[in-house]
Curated annotation (Swiss-Prot):
HAMAP family: EF_P. Its main location: cytoplasm. It is found in: Cytoplasm. This is Elongation factor P. Involved in peptide bond synthesis. Stimulates efficient translation and peptide-bond synthesis on native or reconstituted 70S ribosomes in vitro. Probably functions indirectly by altering the affinity of the ribosome for aminoacyl-tRNA, thus increasing their reactivity as acceptors for peptidyl transferase. PROSITE patterns: EFP. GO terms for biological process: peptide biosynthetic process.
Length: 189
């Protein structure tokens, strides 16, 4: 365990609070006009998945657990959870549905991901920044509709909705940012 000041806590960090491990979901520093600056942290308890919010003074000490970030390859999903393999030593790890969260929509067989592991237990998953998916359906473009936004809604092959430019049609492969489901560019393949 390492003691750090609260203002240095970031999303994905693992904190030890009162002997229990938590994964940080969001961390924001607030500097009010009067009073001391504070750090608002939303966390998920690793043992049971309960979400907790904490507020600390930015200079307060918190304990950050040692977490190892290891590259893994996604294999498949079954009743147990999501199976990943370490390409270096062929060890397999199962990640449960709660740990995956909304990221499961972007998993593709053979995809390389970074797993944060604490004492052999996978705590968090980091996907590649961009993935290539196919547009399954999109609305037709209305000619002359330039006064409004130039993007239109579209459904991706993984079931996620996003906004794409008017020239993108169903069947087109596009690059999507996994962090916020936004369109990046048309796929070059």
């Amino acid at each position: 365990m390492v003691k750090v000041i609260a203002s240095s806590v970031r999303k994905g960090n693992v904190l030890d609070v009162d002997g229990k491990l938590y994964v940080v979901l969001t961390a924001q520093n607030f500097h009010p006009g009067k009073g001391t600056p504070v750090t608002q942290v939303d966390m998920r308890r690793i043992v049971d998945g309960v979400k907790v919010s904490e507020r600390w003074r930015t200079t307060e000490q918190v304990e950050r657990a040692f977490v190892e970030d290891v590259s893994f390859q996604y294999l498949y999903e079954d009743g147990e959870g999501f199976h990943f393999m370490n390409p270096g030593n062929y060890d397999q790890v199962v990640v449960d549905v709660e740990t995956m969260g909304d990221q499961k929509a972007y998993l593709q067989e053979g995809m390389s991901c970074i797993l944060s592991i604490h004492e052999g237990i996978p705590l968090a998953l980091e996907l590649p920044r961009h993935v290539t998916l196919e547009i399954t359906e999109t609305e037709p473009v209305v000619k002359g509709q330039t006064a409004s936004s130039s993007y239109k809604p579209a459904m991706l092959s993984n079931g996620v909705r996003t906004m794409v430019p008017p020239h993108i049609n169903a069947g087109t492969r596009v690059v999507i940012a996994t962090e916020d489901n936004s369109y990046v560019e048309r796929a070059k393949d």
